[in-house]
Design a protein with these regions (language model features):
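RNase H-like, metal-dependent nuclease domains and their acidic two-metal-ion catalytic environment used
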Residues: 1-155, 159, 163, 173-242
Length: 242
């Protein structure tokens, strides 16, 4: 079924593999117009969001993603992203807060995550353990949040993260406050790369002088708690790695 094939591949992979179209390596994985279109005025559009309050979204559940220093590409520096998941199946995700942790020791990075658990009703923490400080941060975080999930980045898993995020953007299911301008830069820094074997994967491009791709990967590690295909039944990940 052609629709199933499209769901299982990014638009560029579909064009490259099934339509015999050439896809240029190094292009941004996410359309700038789509990214800008996901931005909203949080103060007007999110009545439950009080960013300077002790509990910015009250008791609403949130999912947190953490991207470790340097592990998801060549230009990352580590970041945490806080996302409010939809309250109903198929609803919208909202990135309500982000923080970059560049220059912090792994104990301090884990402390940043712990501080978020004091301010938010955290249901999920996805942690990149591929490299950098990730494994050490995970070992600390699981002491105060035993349900934290470690994710190992591979060619396939990064593709899954990007596919999920593209799906959310296409369906209008992801929003961020326009004040979070670095998020646009972060997602625009995620580039498609073709391996020697012809497999398309994704990395952050440091050669272009961008070091904020970490915010994008952290956001994707939060939203992937709703796996591809799980948007209609509220299904969430229960596996420890992917």
């Amino acid at each position: 079924d052609i629709d199933e094939i499209r769901e299982e591949n990014t638009e560029d992979e579909f064009r490259n593999l099934y339509m015999c179209e050439f896809v240029r390596e190094g292009e941004s994985a996410f359309s700038l117009n789509s990214l800008i279109g996901c931005g909203v005025d949080g103060y007007d559009d999110w009545p439950d969001w009080k960013p300077f309050a002790p509990r910015p979204v009250g008791n609403r559940p949130v999912w947190i993603g953490y991207d470790a220093n340097g592990s998801s590409g060549n230009g990352d520096s580590g970041a945490v992203s806080v996302v409010v998941p939809p309250s109903v199946p198929g609803g919208r995700f909202r990135t309500v807060e982000t923080r970059r942790v560049q220059g912090l020791e792994f104990e301090e990075q884990a402390k940043v995550i712990e501080e978020f658990t004091f301010r938010y009703n955290v249901e999920h923490i996805g942690i990149d353990v591929t490299g950098g400080n990730g494994e050490a941060v995970y070992q600390i975080v699981k002491r105060f949040f035993p349900m934290a999930i470690p994710y190992t980045f591979t060619l396939s898993s990064k593709r899954t993260l990007v596919l999920k995020m593209m799906q959310l953007m296409r369906s209008g299911r992801w929003e961020y406050d326009r004040g979070e301008r670095e998020l646009v830069t972060a997602f625009n820094a995620v580039r498609r790369v073709k391996t020697p074997g012809g497999f398309i994967t994704y990395e952050t491009d440091r050669a272009r002088g961008v070091s904020h791709g970490d915010l994008a990967w952290a956001t994707m590690l939060a939203v992937i708690n709703e796996p591809i295909g799980g948007e209609n039944d509220g299904q969430q990940f229960t596996v420890m790695e992917f």
